[in-house]
C-alpha cells in the first residue's frame, strides 16, 4: 500500500463522504446553508475559516478560497495569516471581535470569556452570535475531518 497525500479541504471533503449516502448529502446541505445564512456574512466566515486553518496548520485549507467570499481582498487574507488582524486598519471592529472569538473557540469553546462573547453580540446580534457558534463548530469539524482524510492510505 502506498501512502499518498490528498489535498483535502473543507470544500472538497464531500468527494470522500459520498459513500455515506444520505448522511453525506445532509452534511453537505448544512455546509452550504452555513455560507448562505443571513446573520454572519460569508466574508466574515471565510476569515474565521482561514484563521482556524492557520491555527490547525491545515495547508490544503489555507490554499483554498470559498467562492461565496470572493469579495475578500487577498492582501487582507495575508494580513490575517500573518496574525496582523488585531492592528491592521483593513479589519473592522466586527471582524476583530469575531476573529478574537474564533481564536478563543479554537483553544476551548467552554473557556470563552463573557466579554469576548458580548463583543460579538454587540456587532452581530444574538442571532448572529448563535449562527457564528454553529458555523465555527461545523467549519472546525470539517477542517479536522479533511486533515484526517488527507493522510488516509489509498
Where are these regions (language model features)?
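Hydrophobic alpha-helical segments
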Residues: 1-154
Amino acid at each position: 500500500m502506498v501512502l499518498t497525500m490528498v489535498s483535502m479541504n473543507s470544500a472538497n471533503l464531500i468527494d470522500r463522504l459520498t459513500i455515506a449516502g444520505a448522511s453525506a448529502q445532509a452534511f453537505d446541505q448544512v455546509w452550504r446553508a452555513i455560507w448562505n445564512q443571513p446573520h454572519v456574512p460569508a466574508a466574515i466566515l471565510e476569515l474565521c475559516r482561514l484563521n482556524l486553518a492557520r491555527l490547525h496548520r491545515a495547508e490544503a485549507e489555507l490554499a483554498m478560497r470559498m467562492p461565496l467570499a470572493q469579495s475578500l481582498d487577498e492582501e487582507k487574507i495575508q494580513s490575517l495569516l500573518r496574525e496582523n488582524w488585531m492592528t491592521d486598519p483593513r479589519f473592522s471592529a466586527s471582524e476583530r471581535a469575531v476573529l478574537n472569538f474564533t481564536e478563543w473557540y479554537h483553544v476551548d469553546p467552554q473557556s470563552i470569556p463573557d466579554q469576548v462573547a458580548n463583543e460579538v453580540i454587540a456587532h452581530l446580534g444574538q442571532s448572529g452570535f448563535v449562527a457564528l457558534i454553529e458555523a465555527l463548530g461545523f467549519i472546525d469539524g470539517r477542517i479536522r475531518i479533511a486533515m484526517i482524510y488527507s493522510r488516509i492510505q489509498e
